[in-house]
Amino acid sequence: MPERESKQDVRVGVFVCHCGSNIGGVIDCKALADYSKTLKNVVYAEDNLYTCSETGLASIKKAIKEHNLNRVVVASCTPRTHEPLFRECITEEGLNPYLFNFVNIRDQCTWVHMKYPKEAFEKAKDLIRMGTAKAVKLEPLDMIMIKINPAALVIGGGVAGMSSALSLSRQGFKTYLIEKEDKLGGRLNSLYKLFPYEIDSTEFVEKIISNVNSAQNLEVYTSTKVKNIEGFVGNYEIEVEQNDKKINLTAGAIVVAVGSSLLTPKNLFGYDGKVRITQYELETKLRNNEIEAKDIIMIQCVGSRNDERPYCSSVCCMTALKNALIIKDKIPYANVMILFRDLYTPGTEYEEYYRRAREKGILFIKYDLNRLPIVEEKQIKVYNEYIGEEMIFPYDLLVLSTPLIANNDNKELAQLLKVPLESNNFFLEAHVKLRPSDFATDGIFIGGSAKWPVDITEAITQGYAAASRASTILSHETIKVEGATSSLPEYNKNLCSGCEVCIKVCPYHAIKKTETDEIEIIEALCKGCGVCGATCTNQAIVIKHFTDPQILSEIFVFGGKEI
């Protein structure tokens, strides 16, 4: 449908959502809609139980037709989840999607002021008045069209990366799989059995590697590191290095599945790599039938869930249970004990694993972070929380359950990809619930323990999820990306002093200096965060959809004036 004329007299429609009882249970939404009708340029207003429902969306479309609306304001929940829905709704009726304004009267009003409904109602009136004032100043914007290169780059040849690469190649996309080690498989190459079914790790990973090597549309580069990445969603140029040889690749989407590393517990519980070893080292001994110990003690949460690493590694408990059960199968007379702070066995299958361990005679003793076990030459002292006494146990073999930690080169790769890391140097997804496989940077996706410690099953699932997200881009010849970006209009270029502050502060690396020393904003990379505009001392940069007149109109109308 062709877009409606937006430069005629402004006609605003306001739609107030009850959001069930989230908003309607605190303030009078009908009265709020009636108030909206009194505002300048508002020609229609109504309230809905759920504006995002089919009925609510149909009501918006009907009002646009019947009242010739050319601006729409929805006062409801949060734009993070629902703005795309309402933009699509008005677009179907011929309005430019940027002639829509979202007013959050739930998160910013009724949720935080639920005990003060009278004051919340007055604040909601202010928010709608301000949102309507901005809507009057809105201008139509064009979405940016980008041509897509239907190829994918997967960084990391572990189980998550291989799963992702196989999925993409089977969908018909040219796929490049990059692995820095000389063999695919990652940590699976060194494990013995996989929980909870105790499948042989080598057989499992070799089958996946065989599928990768025989796959069509899939090129594998082992002993290869990423050296440089340029471009944006749909058009990435990647330089990799394999055995000192540089190779140039191009891709439309990138999947990051570089996995994680294992903590070496130096200076923790007397670790020596011989009698006091890690679970990872125990796997090798079990595979080679090198376990002869009679008294075996395992300590959980070694180097994790503390001030230095406050997170739970999630796989350590199940790994300990698995290895303890294998030891009991190999050496039935062995005394196996697990010292734990908390046991993490989610789901019925994993809980059943724990029950099996108890039935096999494996002992569990809970210890406290403030009273850590004391490891001596051939015995260990532990304060038993349940009986309130210190207990002494002999050991022939002490096994330390250490966490998965972020790779040392994550920072370097994050800088190349222009994506963020979280506080523990794992990669940070765009949103843990809404966009768990995406980065904030369009066209780059993540899976496996690169973003957080996960087990094999979860790593495979996340690898497929990342491939699925990447395919939503690669399956199109062109895509539209955000139009509300920063810009340096021609009429403002004489204001630019070339200070380059905008280049330094841009978190998406969307601004660069050209060969002619002019500032250039790559709109396909820009997310419209506004940092550059806020730091530009000469006001040369314009933030589309958040222009000075639009923001000032909200401020002035809040104070009882207009601009």
Question: Can you say where each PLM-predicted feature lies in the sequence?
Answer:
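Flanking helices and flexible, charged tails adjoining ferredoxin-like Fe-S electron-transfer domains
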Residues: 2-12, 142, 189-214, 218-219, ...
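Mid-to-C-terminal Rossmann-like scaffold of FAD/NAD(P)H-dependent oxidoreductases
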Residues: 2-12, 158-161, 337, 341-375, ...
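Beta1-alpha1 glycine-rich phosphate/pyrophosphate-binding loop at the start
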Residues: 3-69, 73-74, 78-109, 150, ...
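Rossmann-like dinucleotide/flavin-binding elements
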Residues: 4-9, 55, 65-67, 110-115, ...
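Cysteine-centered iron-sulfur cluster-binding motifs in ferredoxin-type domains/subunits
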Residues: 16-26, 121, 125, 154-169, ...
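Iron-sulfur cluster-binding cysteine motifs and their immediate structural context
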Residues: 77-80, 169-183, 187, 218-221, ...
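Ferredoxin-like iron-sulfur electron-transfer modules
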Residues: 139-155, 159-160, 189-203, 232-247, ...
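A Rossmann-like FAD-binding core segment of flavoenzymes
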Residues: 205-261, 321-409, 513-514
